[in-house]
């Protein structure tokens, strides 16, 4: 071992044996706060909620943090609020307290006005509601679907039959031991059919408790809807006025994904293992009388993959196979865990044990004929339900032949073992693990310092071009790219060699050209490995490109989402400035949407899916990524479609990163595309998340109609842009006239009307009236949410006979400019 290695080893060993406690923010997993019941900040409910959260997070509750659980209630009906926290059983009191305190602060950011809230972290769960939630054994709510197109009055025969049905399903004599029961009550047209299906690994008592809880919640979540599906982690409850028995249904489901990505070099192998194991489980479940299977498979020497699949018992073998195969192919296998739940079947995979292994007969982890590949560094799996899983695991054994070997997981493994032996059986494993994390960080800092010096020397020796910030050459007053001062040197992207890009694109051969914009040209490239990429080459004559180039690298390098285009790297060599993206097989949305022939490939089902995908991508930018990012140039030309017509938001050259507490910003440099710009941005340079919401609303109008917002539309002797035209149709009750004629009769009237309604809420003139993206996604996925009445949109075109109030010339000019479809780089300051 070298002297350097010896020094580092002794330093880490001393650090580990002396270090005791280190606080860190809990790891966020998921939250649920349906906005079907909300409160105002000046209400008695909010006052009671503040008191409750203060009780739950109080440092005085030391005994509760020791036990890991506390529940409480504040106020009287109807403003009574009850809540609880539940910490993971292996955590010390101080970590439990830290998680609860963090969750209490986080809840009013993630769920600012919702009454029924659950926040999940790796270390704890926080829950509160206007309902009774004082039991730690309450089932974990996941999602519900209850379309509002079929409802019943409270005093109807259907209501009586529903009460009878729910009483039967939740009775003490129900079939909880088998985990499934169906029943029917009443006669047509008031017949109601229902069923419950419990997860195959839960006990009869857990099944009974889940079904009973779900039955009680139907009156709150879906009080007057005839067709209802409630999903919980332990069971599903369904009922309808239609026959739902022995019929496969894959509509109205939800995909949940772990926030951590599988490392890129392991994604292909991990996906193959997930699909292989899931397919084996699918066959076993279809052949099982319980229509259930759970099994595991080795991923690395110290990590196993755990999978679970299930169908409702009433499905035939073939229907079960078909249902599971359909949803398995849509699982988010780029993540280290995920699930897809639909009414008739469900599937889930994790890198940690999330089901009751003792309750299922599951095959041993599969052994390959060849030894498993050497383990590589992958994200530490997050614990699932009913599991005890280490936060850090030893991944491989390594030699100390080179200094950099000290960074490999095998060295971490040795250190963990040494410290574990020193602490004895009574040692605190959580403290040890946290100490290891801190020690590794210290080691990384030393490693970076040493190799920075060595790298600089090597670059000087071989004449390599260092990574430099892209500087503007003019003296124009500019705005910062990001509030945290990020630059291209800290983006963390891979820098490509220019010669490799030239070879991949055949020296930028015109036949490989995919398109051209204000930034420059985009080419298709193929590397020797067969990997296809999209190469975006900055035009040397572009006045705006240098700034946008750096901005795009800084922003996109930090993003990972299935509905965002992925940046693979960049190239800086001489005057060449190039971005390398994943190759998206189809072109942009406008290529299909506004072409009379190509638009026929986008039926309503696909367009509805595209709307939802775009919404989820923007939600990730605004809320779910570790940064808050405002796109500022959302339009059909910046939405790419992959081989399956899934949308990917692209072109982040205009994007801005917000600070943690920042909600809006001002700029003198208005960039983007008129027609998609929100009024406050185009006129005053004020932009926020609500600016993107406005652009999203315009985009939805274009997707539904297949028409450009920049065109002019005649109606009642008036000339309108698409936004105003839609508003007039809505006001006249003829909103379906907006629908693209290429659909024919193949569309859902309710879905299209709801999408138009949501889009009108997005384009309202007052910023505060527009919903945020989280609410929009919930509106799109939960038809039971009641929508507000939309107000007049911004940039409203009035008819010649309408009264026009006095407005400034700047507003008049911008209203006319809003029909221009050109990309704008700057306008005169106002």
Swiss-Prot record:
* Parts of the chain on the Extracellular side: 24-430
- Residue positions with a glycan: 35, 182, 216, 261, 287, 298, 356, 428
Q: Membrane topology type, per the record?
A: Single-pass membrane protein
One short Pfam name that applies is: PK_Tyr_Ser-Thr
Signal sequence span is 1-23
Q: What is its EC number?
A: 2.7.11.-
Q: Biased composition, Pro residues: where in the chain?
A: 370-382
The species is Arabidopsis thaliana (Mouse-ear cress)
Name the UniProt record assigns to this protein: Putative cysteine-rich receptor-like protein kinase 23
Keywords in alphabetical order: ATP-binding, Glycoprotein, Kinase, Membrane, Nucleotide-binding, Phosphoprotein, Receptor, Repeat, Serine/threonine-protein kinase, Signal, Transferase, Transmembrane, Transmembrane helix
Enumerate the spans annotated as Protein kinase domain: 508-787
- Transmembrane stretches in the record are 431-451
The UniProt entry, under Gene3D superfamilies, shows: Gnk2 domain, C-X8-C-X2-C motif, Phosphorylase Kinase, domain 1, Transferase(Phosphotransferase) domain 1
Residues covered by region (Disordered): 363-382
Q: Which residues form the Gnk2-homologous domain?
A: 27-133, 140-244, 250-354
* InterPro entries per the UniProt record, alphabetical: GNK2, GNK2_sf, Kinase-like_dom_sf, Prot_kinase_dom, Protein_kinase_ATP_BS, Ser-Thr/Tyr_kinase_cat_dom, Ser/Thr_kinase_AS
The UniProt catalytic activity note for this protein reads:
L-seryl-[protein] + ATP = O-phospho-L-seryl-[protein] + ADP + H(+); L-threonyl-[protein] + ATP = O-phospho-L-threonyl-[protein] + ADP + H(+)
């Amino acid at each position: 071992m070298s002297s350097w290695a010896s020094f580092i080893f002794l330093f880490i060993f001393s650090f580990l044996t002396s270090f005791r406690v280190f606080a860190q923010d809990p790891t966020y997993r998921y939250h649920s706060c349906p906005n079907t019941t909300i409160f105002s900040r000046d209400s008695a409910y909010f006052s009671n909620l503040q008191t409750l959260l203060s009780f739950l997070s109080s440092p005085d509750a030391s005994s509760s943090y020791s036990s890991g659980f506390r529940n409480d209630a504040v106020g009287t009906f109807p403003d009574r609020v009850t809540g609880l926290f539940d910490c993971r059983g292996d955590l010390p009191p101080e970590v439990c307290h830290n998680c609860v305190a963090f969750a209490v602060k986080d809840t009013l950011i993630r769920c600012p006005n919702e009454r029924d809230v659950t926040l999940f972290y790796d270390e704890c769960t926080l829950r509160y509601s206007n309902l009774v939630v004082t039991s730690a054994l309450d089932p974990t709510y996941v999602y519900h679907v209850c379309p509002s197109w079929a409802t019943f009055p409270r005093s109807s025969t259907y209501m009586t039959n529903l009460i009878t049905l729910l009483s039967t399903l939740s009775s003490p004599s129900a079939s909880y031991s088998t985990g499934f029961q169906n029943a029917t009550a009443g006669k047509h047209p008031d017949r109601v059919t229902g069923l419950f299906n419990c997860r195959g690994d839960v006990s009869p008592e857990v099944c009974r408790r889940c079904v009973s809880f779900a039955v009680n919640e139907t009156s709150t979540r879906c009080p007057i809807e005839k067709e209802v599906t409630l999903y919980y982690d332990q069971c599903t409850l369904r009922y309808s006025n239609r026959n739902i028995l022995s019929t496969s249904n894959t509509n109205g489901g939800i995909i949940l994904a772990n926030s951590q990505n599988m490392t890129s070099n392991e994604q292909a192998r991990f996906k193959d293992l997930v699909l292989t194991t899931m397919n084996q489980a699918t066959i076993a479940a279809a052949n099982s009388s319980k229509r259930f299977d759970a099994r595991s498979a080795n991923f690395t020497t110290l990590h196993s993959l755990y999978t679970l699949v299930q169908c409702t018992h009433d499905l035939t073998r073939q229907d079960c196979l078909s249902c599971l195969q359909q949803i398995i192919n849509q699982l988010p296998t780029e993540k280290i865990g995920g699930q897809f739940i639909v009414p008739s079947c469900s599937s889930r995979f994790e890198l940690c044990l999330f089901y009751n292994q003792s309750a299922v007969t599951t095959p041993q982890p599969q052994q390959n004929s060849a030894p498993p590949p050497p383990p590589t560094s992958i994200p530490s799996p997050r614990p699932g339900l009913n599991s005890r899983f280490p936060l850090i695991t030893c991944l491989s054994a390594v030699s100390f032949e080179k200094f950099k070997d000290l960074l490999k997981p095998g060295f971490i493994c040795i250190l963990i073992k040494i410290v574990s032996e020193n602490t004895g059986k009574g040692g605190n494993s959580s403290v040890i693990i946290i100490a290891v994390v801190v020690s590794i960080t210290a080691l990384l800092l030393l490693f970076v310092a040493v190799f920075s010096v060595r790298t600089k020397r090597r670059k000087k020796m071989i004449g390599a071009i260092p990574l430099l910030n892209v500087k503007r050459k003019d003296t124009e007053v500019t705005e910062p790219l990001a509030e945290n001062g990020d630059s291209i040197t800290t983006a963390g992207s891979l820098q490509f060699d220019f010669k490799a890009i030239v070879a991949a694109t055949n020296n930028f051969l015109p036949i490989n050209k995919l398109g051209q914009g204000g930034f420059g040209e985009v080419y298709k490239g193929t590397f020797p490995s067969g990997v296809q990429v999209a190469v975006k080459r900055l035009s040397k004559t572009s006045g705006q490109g240098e700034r946008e180039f750096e901005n795009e690298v800084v922003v996109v390098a930090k993003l990972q989402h299935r509905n965002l285009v992925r940046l693979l790297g960049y190239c800086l060599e001489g005057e060449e400035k190039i971005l390398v993206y994943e190759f998206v097989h189809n072109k942009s949305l406008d290529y299909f949407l506004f072409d009379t022939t190509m638009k026929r490939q986008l039926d309503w089902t696909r367009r509805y899916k595209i709307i939802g995908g775009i919404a989820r991508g923007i939600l990730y930018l605004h809320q779910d990524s570790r940064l808050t990012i405002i796109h500022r140039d959302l339009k059909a030309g910046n939405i790419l479609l992959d081989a399956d017509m899934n949308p990917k938001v692209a072109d982040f050259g205009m994007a801005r990163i917000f600070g943690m507490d920042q909600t809006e910003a001002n700029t003198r440099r208005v960039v983007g595309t008129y027609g998609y710009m929100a009024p406050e941005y185009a006129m005053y340079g004020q932009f926020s998340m609500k600016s993107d919401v406005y652009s999203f609303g315009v985009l939805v109008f274009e997707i539904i109609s297949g028409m450009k917002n920049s065109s002019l539309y005649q109606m009642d002797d008036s000339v309108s842009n698409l936004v105003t035209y839609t508003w007039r149709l809505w006001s006249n009750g003829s909103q379906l006239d907006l629908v693209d004629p290429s659909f024919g009769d193949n569309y859902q009237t309710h879905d299209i009307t709801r999408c138009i309604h949501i889009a009108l809420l997005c384009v309202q003139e007052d910023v505060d009236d527009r919903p945020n993206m989280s609410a929009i996604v919930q509106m799109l996925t939960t038809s039971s949410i009641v929508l507000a009445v939309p107000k007049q949109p911004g940039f409203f075109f009035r008819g010649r006979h309408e009264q026009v109030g006095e407005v400034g010339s700047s507003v008049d000019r911008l209203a006319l400019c809003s029909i221009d479809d050109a990309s704008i780089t700057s306008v005169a300051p106002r």
